[in-house]
Amino acid sequence: MGETVLLAAGGTGGHVFPGLATAAALHDARPDLEIAFVGTADRLEARLVPEAGWPLHTVPAMALRKDLSALKLPVVLGRAVSATRQLIRQSDVIAAVCFGGYTSVPLALAARTTGTPLVVHEQNAVPGRANKLASRAAAAVAVTFEQAADGFGSTRTVLTGNPVRPGLLPDAAPGEDLVAVRARLRDEALSTFGLRPDRRTLLVFGGSQGARQINRALTGAVGRWTRPEELQVLHATGSRTHDETVAAWEAVEHGGLHVVVEEFISRMDL
């Protein structure tokens, strides 16, 4: 295995997708680099990272909840750090990057104890708990919003913005203008999601895990819409609230409204 950059981006799309965008950019800049991810076997990264073509090494991890047992945390965290440290030593890891999520802390601690350079990327205006902990071992923290720098104390911060994966930017075929690109993507979206071409579409989403208040507000407002027969809804419920939202849609009178419910939409480029 050649020189490797190890990334931790897990739990939610807000962490995973910037990680995937960074992996693609690193590969474009240095095709000789090996890119690998650290993650958990039962979270979003377990599907998205392999789908993007990158290897995922799974380690034990758990949410950094405030009510977490003081007895459980050291045990599980210790196992995750040990597994990540072993991965670093088995590979020629020249740098590590944390994007937040459960596995960022184990990677940060493993990087610190092996002398591996570490960078943290924070996507939010208010830093998450995992990244704040990981930043203590980082050479620098890249932030999307300038105000996020206040949450990282004395650690050096750099305003970089949020990495955007190439798939969100439409690729035009030779000789294809923007109008043709939009028409092609529209046809693909109609086919992919089972939407109707003669209706206006409302897209509703609240992140990969879901936003219960958004979901409830949407299903609760359906009966008050005018001319619902002219509309359709593409609703991404999120993983945590999918079943209850499907049940809510089944319980309301649609009034001719065409509804497509998905747990997660990976083709946001459409």
Regions found by a protein language model. Name each.
Residues 4, 32-36, 55, 117, ...:
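Residues at the starts of beta-strands that form the adenosine-phosphate
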Residues 4-10, 27, 32-79, 83, ...:
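Conserved nucleotide-sugar phosphate-binding/catalytic loop shared by glycosyltransferases and other
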Residues 15-28:
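Short amphipathic alpha-helix
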Residues 30, 87-94, 195-197:
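Glycine-rich phosphate-binding loop signature in dinucleotide/nucleotide-binding domains
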Residues 43, 48, 52, 174-177, ...:
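Donor-nucleotide binding loops and adjacent catalytic segments primarily
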Residues 43-47, 95-114:
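An aromatic- and histidine-rich active-site surface loop
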Residues 60-92, 105-113, 129-137:
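Alpha-helical membrane-targeting segments
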Residues 112-190:
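Active-site-proximal region of nucleotide-activated glycan assembly enzymes
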